[in-house]
A protein has these predicted regions:
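Conserved mixed alpha/beta catalytic, RNA-binding, or beta-rich assembly cores of soluble enzyme
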Residues: 2-78, 82-92, 98-100, 104, ...
Length: 112
């Protein structure tokens, strides 16, 4: 079983995020944390079935739950499988920060 851990540090609007992707042949675990030490947060599971990816929150949180679903569906779609996403935020994300984080996740996927 091929596994690959890819990590990145990303800054958006003065906030620092750690992104970790642990890839498997049929999906990945992703952790996005607004903490230097990396913290677990709200958990969302996404899966690609047919042409679509769908998400479900296992551990919901008020900050960023829609964003976690977006990241999960992006990963499930690109990797043709299952994505489990943990998102830890200190405060709500603005649109520019979301775009920056999505672009960073896409860059990490290209390092494949």
């Amino acid at each position: 079983v091929e596994r690959k851990l890819i990590s990145s540090k990303c800054e958006a609007r003065g906030r620092v995020y750690i992104i970790d992707l642990l890839q498997f042949t049929n999906g990945c675990f992703a952790n996005i944390s607004e903490d230097q030490n990396g913290k677990m947060g709200a958990i969302t599971v996404s899966i690609k079935t047919g042409e679509r990816a769908t998400s479900s929150s296992l551990i919901p949180e008020s900050k960023g739950s829609i964003f976690a679903g977006m990241i999960g569906e992006l990963l499930a779609d690109k990797l043709h499988g299952i994505a489990v996403v943990s998102l830890y935020l200190r405060e709500e994300l603005d649109t520019d920060s979301m775009k920056t984080l999505i672009n960073e996740v896409r860059k990490l996927l290209k390092k494949d």
